[in-house]
């Protein structure tokens, strides 16, 4: 499942997981989308085939990214557009307690090292005994810079030509 915006992505993920209980379902959500739709985590029919990654930067970072019109307002964008400091202001306890109290396995990461310590557990192909939430704490400056780097990557002409040939002739 997938889409754009905050309207029901977590609920859609849960519905898909109920329809196919033998498959593992992954969802990646920003904090605004997650908090908007988090009540579905308490659905009594949720199974152990759900994995949710929550990117918690404490605001709607897309409104602060270098390529969004809201970025022109700088810090004012946080207050009036990006909903900064909402839902516990990046609390390290709020989602942890909510998820654990509902029976989810809770994992967290605030650095690359911490992420590397938990990502294997989160992405295991094995069905686990509980659904999972992995909350990753980030900041909007790093996210915007990463987006800018990704959007401005250049591919060498040789690499493009090589890929075209592979597409036409197929892999070895």
Locate each region found by the language model:
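Thiamine diphosphate
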Residues: 1-172
């Amino acid at each position: 499942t997938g889409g754009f915006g905050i309207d029901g992505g977590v609920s859609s993920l849960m519905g898909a997981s109920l329809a196919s209980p033998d498959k593992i379902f992954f969802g990646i959500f920003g904090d605004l989308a997650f908090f908007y739709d988090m009540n579905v985590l308490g659905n009594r029919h949720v199974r152990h085939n759900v994995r949710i990654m929550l990117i918690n930067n404490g605001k709607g970072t897309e409104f602060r990214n270098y390529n969004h019109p809201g970025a022109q307002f700088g810090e004012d964008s946080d207050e009036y557009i990006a909903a900064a400091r909402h839902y516990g202001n990046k609390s390290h306890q709020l989602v942890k307690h909510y998820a654990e109290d509902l029976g989810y396995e809770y994992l967290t990461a605030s650095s690359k090292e911490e992420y590397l310590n938990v990502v294997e557990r989160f992405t295991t192909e094995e069905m686990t005994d509980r659904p999972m939430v992995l909350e990753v704490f980030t900041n909007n400056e790093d996210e915007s810079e990463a987006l800018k780097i990704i959007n401005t990557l250049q591919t060498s002409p040789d690499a493009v030509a090589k890929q075209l040939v592979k597409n036409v002739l197929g892999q070895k």
